[in-house]
């Protein structure tokens, strides 16, 4: 049996939670999304454990770093894969001031996004994101934030296929932005970055120890990174996130 993060397994789980074939579990993304759609109660749905409901500061920092890699500075459209309930999607539409399409396997998550996190620039689609993922639009940039195919495995072939399918949805000069917690405790795409760059024939740039809250007070990437390293030693745990840009 494959691990839960593979697209076909995620779809099975999504259907099971949505159709009440399994016991409700708010620790699971799909269980939380179902509860949130029904109640719009942030606390009782435990949505804060699954989605960043206040992502503005984080996304502004990512945009600031990412902008230098965009050949087309006037972005007309953004793709947000694994968008969940749409909090980040809506904010991205506001800070970029352009159209954005959020895609997630969760029907409940997408329905919540349509109801509560929509504006004139947002579109939401419930669809599985696998090696055959293909929409009818070409996007200028794709955001993949805490996206399971990149955060839960170092399966090189799987990640190559997912990234290839994402780039099939991007314009010729499109950019893929990956943002996730930086940790040495589990296997992630960080194990494969350089090899993926070669296989995909894409340039790649990585930033480690990215921490929006620290950056707010120390608005210099290298100094804020140093602060994260020091805090990590003091606290004996990982501090900060990793930003990976394929372009």
Protein language model annotation of sequence segments:
Residues 113-114:
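Conserved SAM-binding loop
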Residues 2-70:
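Conserved class I S-adenosyl-L-methionine
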Residues 106:
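Conserved SAM/SAH-binding beta-strand->alpha-helix loop
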Residues 119-130:
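Conserved SAM-binding strand-loop segment of SAM-dependent methyltransferases
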Residues 143:
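A conserved beta-strand element that flanks and buttresses the S-adenosyl-L-methionine
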Residues 85-96:
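Conserved SAM-binding loop of SAM-dependent methyltransferases across substrates and taxa
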Residues 158-172:
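A short glycine-rich, Lys/Arg-flanked "PGG" loop and its adjoining helix->strand segment in the class I
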Residues 173-180:
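Conserved beta-strand signature within the Rossmann-like core of class I S-adenosyl-L-methionine
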């Amino acid at each position: 049996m494959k691990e839960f993060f593979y697209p076909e397994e995620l779809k099975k789980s999504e259907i099971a939670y949505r159709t009440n074939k399994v016991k409700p579990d708010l620790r699971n993304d799909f269980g939380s999304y179902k509860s949130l759609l029904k109640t719009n109660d942030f606390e009782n749905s435990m949505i804060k454990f699954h989605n960043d409901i206040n992502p503005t500061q984080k996304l502004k920092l990512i945009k600031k770093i990412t902008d230098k890699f965009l050949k087309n500075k006037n972005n007309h459209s953004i793709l947000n894969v694994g968008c969940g309930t749409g909090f980040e999607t809506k904010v991205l539409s506001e800070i970029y001031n352009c159209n954005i399409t959020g895609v997630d396997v969760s029907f409940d998550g997408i329905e919540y996004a349509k109801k509560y996190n929509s504006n004139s620039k947002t579109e939401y689609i419930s669809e599985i994101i696998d090696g055959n993922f293909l929409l009818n639009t070409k996007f200028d940039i794709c955001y993949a934030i805490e996206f399971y195919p990149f955060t839960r495995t170092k399966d090189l072939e799987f990640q190559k296929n997912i990234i290839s399918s994402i780039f099939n949805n991007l314009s010729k000069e499109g950019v893929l932005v990956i943002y996730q917690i930086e940790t040495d405790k589990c296997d992630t795409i960080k194990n494969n970055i350089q090899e993926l760059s070669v296989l995909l024939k894409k340039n790649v740039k990585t930033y480690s120890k990215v921490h929006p809250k620290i950056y707010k007070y120390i608005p210099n990437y290298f100094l804020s990174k140093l602060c994260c390293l020091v805090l990590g030693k003091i606290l004996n745990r990982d501090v900060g996130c990793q930003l990976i840009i394929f372009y």
